[in-house]
Structures are given as structure tokens and as C-alpha cells.
Amino acid sequence: MNHKKFGRTGLRVSRLCLGTMTFGLQCDEAQSQAILNAAHDGGIDFLDTADVYPLGGDRATAGKTEEIVGRWLKGKRQQFIVATKCVGQMGPKPWDQGMSRKHILEAIEASLKRLGTDYVDVYQLHGFDPLTPIDEALEALDAVVKMGKARYVGVSNWLAHRVARALGRSELKSTARIDSVQPRYNLLFRTFERDLLPLCEEEGIAVIPYNPLAGGLLTGKHEQNGTPQQGTRFTLGRAGAMYQARYWHEREFETVEQLRGIAREADMSLATLAVRWVLSNTAITAPIIGASRPEQLADSLAAEEKGPLPADVKARLDQLTDSWRAVAADR
């Protein structure tokens, strides 16, 4: 497994990051540990989680994923880069979510307890909270770093102008700088390229995108004429409707069919093609890959092993999916 510099920091991370949001609902603990073992065996030493996971759960299940990851990490914490996130609703009170100093400082403590560690490598804001001044959030993240409870900080699902403002405010106030972003990015959703990508390249920000396989649609296993398969992202608890709204449309399926043909010509699976396309973008640090079974990691591991796509194949994919750069951000 190759490694890549994490933005402008001195940290290096594996070219694939294992996403864990299926752990605790879509996957039971035994399945989750099998996936973690397979990822480890494949050379992945970068893990991403969040306090609100598992995906599709509710407040009753929030935190289960971190607990599963923490139990598996026992005795091998130093072998991994661990990233987690806060901002989501973790309790019944209005202050149990968001970017307030109170919530961030309490959330990091709770995450560390669940993960069974005294620090995380990357602590990220899982979304943007318009009710909290950005300086308050940055000062809280700075405190987390200075207390030794996180090494770096990042954001997920932030628009480019908010990242730019945070960079400016952190420089002005001498607080911890945003070192990574976690956007949604794949062949069917390329809005990241319009403004956030050039900002990241110019400012030296690591990019760890999620959904490189569009929730599984880019594996080619789904058929539009049928109902979504049970046990997939498209039927998973409260998240099923969100994933169907994102990707379950005629236009997406038409594009997938065209991509399937290119994959056949290139003699690789559609999933491997899709992940190699993401890895071919030089701005990308490590796409976050997920699985509900260990064997599902094989296509992504093959993508990393084979490396960037040949220039002619990438050019065909870029041209075919160029219109997906203009998809509304709320999709």
C-alpha cells in the first residue's frame, strides 16, 4: 500500500482510508472486525469514523461504531491513523450538537472514551453549524490540539467559501488550521472540482473524499427497474431515503451503463475503474472506502495497487461525466 502526504503537514497516510459507518447497524461486530482485519491485511492503516455513526441509526445507536473500532484497536492503536468527527446530534439537548465550544470539547472526550484512546490523529467537524461563530469553533479545535487530544483538524461537507473563511480566521487568530476536507466525490458527483478542489490545491489541504462508489451504485450491482436491495445503503434505516435521493435516478443509471462498457474494455471491474478514477486526481489524498463484507474491499485494493488510470481512459471518463460537475450540492 502506497502512502501520501496529508496536505501540507508532515503526516503520511495510506492511499485508501477505511470508512466505518456501516459498523453497528448494517454490519454486526463480528462482520465489522472481519472488514477491519481485511483492510489491515491489505495495507490500509488509515481509519475514518464519527460519533454519530452507524449510518442509518438514531440517537440510541450513535457511538456504537466508535466503540466497535475502539475494541478492535486495542493493543494496536499505534499502527493506525484514526480520524473521527463531531457536530451531529448526540443527545436530547440543543447543545448536544453543533460547533459550539461546549459541544466540541465534550464530544472529543466522549469519542476518545469510546475509541479507547487518549488522542485521535484527525478531528473533523462533520458539517457546518450556522448558529456558531466560526472563531468559536476554531478556538475550540485549537484547544483540542493544544491539550494533545488531536494532532490535526479538518472539516467534512463544508462549502469552499466557508473553508476559505476558516483558513483566513485561523491565520488571523493563530488558531489550529484546517488541514483536511472530506467532500462527497465520485464519477456521478463532481461538484467538488468547481471551487473546493482548486482551493485545496492552492492551500495544501488534504482531501479524503467519501462515497467514491456512489453508495454502491458504481459497483454495477443495482438495477433501476428493480427495488433497492435490502441490506444496502439504499435501504439502510433512516439513510436509505437519503441515498435514493442522491443516486437512484434514471440519469445516474444511464451513466453507470456507459461506464460499465468502458470498464469492460479496460478489463477491470466497474468498482475498480471508479476508485482508480478518484485516485487519478492528484488533489486526492485518500478516498474513503466502505464495505459491508470483507470481500467488497478487493476492488478498491486492486484500484490502489494498479494506480492511476491510463490517460486515455481517464479522459473518456472525464468527458462522459463532465455534466456531473454541475449537480446541485443538495443532491
Predicted segments, located by residue:
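Acidic (Asp/Glu)-rich catalytic clusters
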Residues: 41, 70-78, 113-116, 145, ...
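Active-site groove signature of glycoside hydrolases
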Residues: 112-131
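N-terminal binding-site loop/beta-alpha segment at the start of enzyme catalytic domains
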Residues: 1-80
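Structural motif corresponding to the early beta-alpha repeats
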Residues: 52-53, 75-99
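Active-site mouth loops of central-metabolism enzymes
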Residues: 20-30, 90-102, 131-132
